[in-house]
Regions:
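Extended, histidine- and acidic-residue-enriched regions that form the cofactor-binding/catalytic faces
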Residues: 1-9, 15-158
Length: 158
């Protein structure tokens, strides 16, 4: 930003970073008030597209579920441990709690390290999830390039 960039998108790919990114953007805004500072998880930007491609009854890319397992099977298949002894883990929140942040460590949420449906993950789906995500991120970047930069308000002097 000190080199003159006027627009910034921090693209998050790990849910645990979300709050830190928001705080960082707020702090940067104080130092660079005339810069368009943005951040998002790829899964938020491509939520509709990912949901349309999912076969599992989840409503989002849960930790190591169908979406994440598929993406890793595409990008780094050597990191996916194929096993049949794990059962899918469906723990959706009741509708009344949707949108509520619940503070939990992953170890408190699951014993096996995943939520959702890793059994539904395939490399073929991973390619589709990746393409949909990249397409949406590019669309967002193109739109950000058309947006006006923030105006810095100067205090009135009387």
């Amino acid at each position: 930003l000190a080199d003159g960039y006027r627009r910034l998108l921090i693209l998050n790919s790990h849910g645990g970073n979300t709050d830190t990114i928001h705080v960082a953007l707020r702090r940067l805004q104080q130092e660079f008030p005339d810069v368009l500072l943005t951040g998002a998880g790829f899964w938020d930007l491509a939520a509709k597209e990912l949901a349309a491609l999912c076969e599992s009854p989840q409503d989002g890319p849960w930790h190591a579920g169908e979406v994440e397992t598929s993406l890793i099977k595409t990008i780094r298949p050597d990191l996916v441990r194929e096993t049949t002894d794990l059962k899918d883990c469906d723990r959706p929140l009741p509708d009344v709690l949707r949108g509520l942040y619940i503070s939990r460590d992953m170890a408190q949420s699951t014993q096996d390290g995943f939520l959702g449906y890793p059994s539904q993950g395939t490399a073929e789906k991973g390619e589709k999830f990746l393409e949909a995500s990249v397409t949406r991120v590019v669309e967002v970047c193109e739109e950000l390039l058309t947006m006006d930069l923030p105006r810095v308000r100067t205090p009135k002097t009387d």
